[in-house]
């Protein structure tokens, strides 16, 4: 494989020395960029964009042409696994993702296949290989998946939800069915991420977008337990190099200690967690990624710079910080504000690495 020219991101995840704090943005390939909108229009619809390796590669690379980001992230969707299980994924305008055949009971769970990563999900692996080739070793490529709990919320609710009453009804009234579903998803995610690593992903991230809607006890049983299983089953080295794993539970700031016990290399923080506090609690064990409020990118560049300075000072001297937003970039953010953010991270962070 091509020699990596910029390995800051991978080094920071392993708490190794870097010259400046690495930075990337969740959803950095997305609708805030006019060139993304043009490519998506060319593809026809969102899943067609995901399933075309050349176009998925193009949108993955677009933000790297604009900004000196320290990592690329595979352009895909967290719902590829449920889609490959045959639930009939479609996108409703203004509604987000929906499934024609949601999971309602144990019998439905029993019928679900575990998708073969190089077969039903082969288009994702083709995209990974294409992106790695086109990156030419400039920066590392991040692969990802949704967490079992987060995937299950969409599969049981039939799409996006605000109150999560349908899946919580299953959790409390038929926990066995939900555990069977989560176990099947954990196996599927492990296979899927390992296939991404074999195809060329140099780091992987598990997005637990909806873990924060659970009580602490339920989070341990229904979300964290299954992420731990995945971490245990992942390839941790490929191509002679360690493959770091990041866990991110949105709304999970109160559970960082438990998350750090999974054996992951890094934890993603949302913007509601104080990064100085997080470092005191778990910084001896894991790297931290985050955690500027994505809405800060609406502010003037001088205000963005102040916020970057505050977060860098909060983390403090030394290694183990990847700068990011606390969640995905909003679609109506001015692209030049994202540029000011990335530039400020690199310029202001050098003083913390000497």
UniProtKB/Swiss-Prot annotation:
One of its GO terms (molecular function) is uroporphyrinogen decarboxylase activity. It catalyses: uroporphyrinogen III + 4 H(+) = coproporphyrinogen III + 4 CO2. Its EC number is 4.1.1.37. GO terms for cellular component: cytosol. Pathway: Porphyrin-containing compound metabolism; protoporphyrin-IX biosynthesis; coproporphyrinogen-III from 5-aminolevulinate: step 4/4. PROSITE patterns: UROD_1, UROD_2. The record marks 77 as: Transition state stabilizer. Keywords: Cytoplasm, Decarboxylase, Lyase, Porphyrin biosynthesis. Pfam families: URO-D. Substrate binds at residues 27-31, 77, 154, 209, 327. SUPFAM superfamilies: UROD/MetE-like (SSF51726). GO terms for biological process: protoporphyrinogen IX biosynthetic process from glutamate. It is an enzyme of class 4 (lyase). Its main location: cytoplasm. It is found in: Cytoplasm. InterPro entries: UROD/MetE-like_sf, Uroporphyrinogen_deCO2ase_HemE, Uroporphyrinogen_deCOase. Belongs to the uroporphyrinogen decarboxylase family. Homodimer. Catalyzes the decarboxylation of four acetate groups of uroporphyrinogen-III to yield coproporphyrinogen-III. This is Uroporphyrinogen decarboxylase. The gene is hemE.
């Amino acid at each position: 494989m091509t020699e990596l020219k910029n390995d800051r991101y991978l080094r920071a995840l392993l708490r190794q020395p870097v010259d400046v704090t690495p930075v990337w943005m969740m959803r950095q390939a997305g609708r805030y960029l006019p060139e993304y909108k043009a490519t998506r229009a060319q593809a026809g619809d969102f899943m067609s964009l995901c399933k075309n390796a050349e176009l998925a590669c193009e949108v993955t690379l677009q933000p790297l042409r604009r900004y000196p980001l320290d990592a690329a992230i595979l352009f895909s969707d967290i719902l590829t696994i449920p889609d490959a299980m045959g639930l009939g994924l479609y996108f409703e305008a203004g509604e987000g993702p929906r499934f024609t055949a949601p999971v309602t009971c144990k019998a439905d769970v029993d019928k679900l296949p575990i998708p073969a990563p190089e077969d039903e999900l082969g288009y994702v692996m083709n995209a990974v290989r294409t992106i790695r080739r086109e990156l030419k070793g400039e920066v590392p490529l991040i692969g990802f998946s949704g967490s079992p709990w987060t995937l299950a919320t969409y599969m049981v609710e039939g799409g996006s939800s605000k109150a999560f009453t349908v899946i919580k009804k299953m959790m409390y009234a038929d926990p066995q069915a939900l555990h069977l579903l989560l176990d099947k998803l954990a196996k599927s995610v492990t296979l899927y991420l390992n296939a991404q690593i074999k195809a060329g992903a140099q780091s992987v991230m598990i997005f637990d977008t909806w873990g924060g809607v659970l009580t602490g006890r339920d989070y341990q049983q229904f979300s964290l337990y299954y992420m731990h299983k995945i971490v245990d089953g992942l390839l941790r080295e490929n191509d002679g190099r360690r493959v770091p794993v990041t866990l991110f539970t949105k709304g999970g700031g109160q559970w960082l200690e438990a998350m750090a016990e999974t054996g992951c290399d890094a934890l993603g923080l949302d913007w509601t967690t104080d990064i100085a506090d997080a470092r005191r609690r778990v910084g001896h064990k894991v790297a931290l990624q985050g955690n500027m409020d994505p809405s800060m990118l609406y502010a003037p560049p001088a205000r963005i710079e102040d916020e970057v300075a505050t977060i860098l000072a909060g983390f403090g001297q030394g290694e183990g910080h990847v700068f990011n937003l606390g969640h995905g970039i909003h679609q109506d953010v001015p692209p030049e504000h994202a540029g000011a953010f990335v530039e400020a991270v690199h310029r202001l962070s050098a003083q913390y690495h000497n």
